[in-house]
Swiss-Prot record:
Something else known: The active form is a dimer, wherein the participating monomers are held together by non-covalent interactions, with the Cys-84 of each monomer present at the dimer interface. In vitro, under oxidizing environment, the dimer gets stabilized by the formation of Cys-84-Cys-84 disulfide bond.
Location in or out of the cell: Cell membrane
Residue stretches making up the ABC transporter domain: 2-227
Domain of life of the organism encoding this protein: Bacteria
GO cellular component: plasma membrane
Protein's name according to its UniProt entry: Cell division ATP-binding protein FtsE
Keyword Cell division in record: yes
GO MF terms held by the record: ATP binding; ATP hydrolysis activity; transmembrane transporter activity
Transmembrane segments: none
Membrane topology value: Peripheral membrane protein
Pfam family, one: ABC_tran
Activity control mechanisms: Requires magnesium or manganese for optimal activity. Inhibited by high concentrations of cobalt and by cupric phenanthroline.
Family recorded in the similarity comment: Belongs to the ABC transporter superfamily.
């Protein structure tokens, strides 16, 4: 599903590689935590999967896509199979909950009848059926993140990338969001989540991939946040 094969990413502005000879394989349907301190390479790792960056050397593959060889019109095709959730929600403030989710399908050319069928289904999945006509500023932070997750999941992506999705949320709301991501994962979607939240990582005991200074320092099944925890 996801393979990084001897991947190095060197930025001209830095003496140290952002990623240094990374070898990782993530299978279909896995739930993986990507951890490490700020500057460890987590964001670069995710940007490579989206073809937002190209590796200096090595190969990046997502499903059938040889990511670092994609050009032009093929990049949007890759991004149709990857959903993204961010810490800051990134909702369209002038659009309703329904329209925020529908927009993700409109931009890839889905027919109106398909949109009208699928959007209510995904709003039901994330527990927002009763708030389809609300604007983002009428929602709590947890509800806004549910909209962001619905938007990322509405096209039934093969992979869901979640970059600190609970970073702005209180512990109880964070747990609700993690329950939702687990439910999505059980549908067969591969979930890769970058986080600094050791409580979430320690409680869920999923696979943990840890980066430090651009190097892969740990890849552990049923891992916890720290080696000594």
């Amino acid at each position: 599903m996801i393979t990084l094969d001897h991947v190095t990413k060197q930025y001209k502005s830095s003496a140290r590689p952002a990623l240094d000879d990374i070898n990782v394989k993530i299978d279909k349907g896995e739930f993986v935590f990507l951890i490490g301190p700020s500057g460890s390479g987590k964001s670069t790792f995710m940007r490579l999967l989206l073809a937002a960056e190209t590796p200096t050397s090595g190969d990046v593959r997502v499903s059938k896509f040889h990511v670092n060889k994609l050009r032009g019109r093929h990049v949007p095709k890759l991004r149709q199979v990857i959903g993204c959730v961010f810490q800051d929600f990134r909702l369209l403030q002038q659009k309703t909950v329904y329209d925020n989710v529908a927009f993700a399908l409109e931009v890839i050319g889905k027919r109106t009848d398909a949109i009208n069928r699928v959007v209510p289904e995904v709003l039901e999945t994330v527990g927002l059926s009763g708030k389809a006509n609300r604007l983002p500023d009428e929602l709590s932070g947890g509800e806004q993140q549910r909209v962001a997750i619905a938007r990322a999941f509405v096209n039934r992506p093969l992979v869901l990338l979640a970059d600190e999705p609970t970073g702005n949320l209180d512990p109880e709301t964070s747990r609700d969001i993690m329950d939702l991501l687990e439910r999505i994962n059980r549908t067969g979607t591969t979930v890769l989540m970058a986080t600094h939240d050791h409580h979430i990582v320690d409680s869920m005991r999923q696979r943990v991939v840890e980066l430090s200074l651009g190097r892969l320092v740990r890849d552990e099944q049923r891992g916890v946040y720290g080696m000594d925890r």
